[in-house]
């Protein structure tokens, strides 16, 4: 997947989440060991969001690409982010947004709340 497709997917996911009532706090939060695509707030919950964009289902659904190893890495990155806050961490969860082109070519998003637990 090209970087441009990934960026378009992240933009579509951010717009979708905002329309769903989330407040985007940060995008592409980088650490030495990786990156958190989106960090958002949903009510009183801090949400770490993994965005997976696919052009088709040849290799499965986008969410299937969030392997156990990817989940562990995202959990470690979330811990690093929370340590930066320095205060008592709020309730947190991990969501996945699957992004794929629809029949009309426009990107479609599907939210998987509480996609995994760390």
UniProtKB/Swiss-Prot annotation:
| Molecular function, one GO term | nucleic acid binding
Q: Which cysteine-cysteine pairs are annotated as disulfide bonds in the entry?
A: none
**Domain of life (superkingdom):** Bacteria
What does the sequence similarity comment in the record state about its family?
A: Belongs to the UPF0102 family.
**Entries under HAMAP family matching the protein:** UPF0102
Protein's name in the database: UPF0102 protein STH1475
In which organism is this protein found?
A: Symbiobacterium thermophilum (strain DSM 24528 / JCM 14929 / IAM 14863 / T)
Q: What is the lineage of its organism?
A: Bacteria, Bacillati, Bacillota, Clostridia, Eubacteriales
């Amino acid at each position: 997947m090209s970087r441009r497709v990934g960026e378009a997917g992240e933009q579509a996911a951010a717009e979708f989440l905002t329309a769903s009532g989330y407040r985007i706090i940060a995008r592409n939060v980088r650490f030495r060991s990786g990156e958190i695509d989106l960090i958002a707030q949903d009510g009183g919950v801090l949400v770490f969001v993994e965005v997976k964009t696919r052009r088709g289902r040849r290799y499965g659904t986008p969410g299937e690409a969030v392997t156990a190893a990817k989940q562990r890495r995202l959990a470690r990155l979330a811990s690093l982010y929370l340590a930066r806050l320095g205060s008592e961490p709020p309730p947190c969860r991990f969501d996945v947004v699957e992004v794929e082109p629809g029949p009309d070519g426009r990107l479609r998003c599907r939210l998987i709340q509480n996609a995994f637990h760390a």
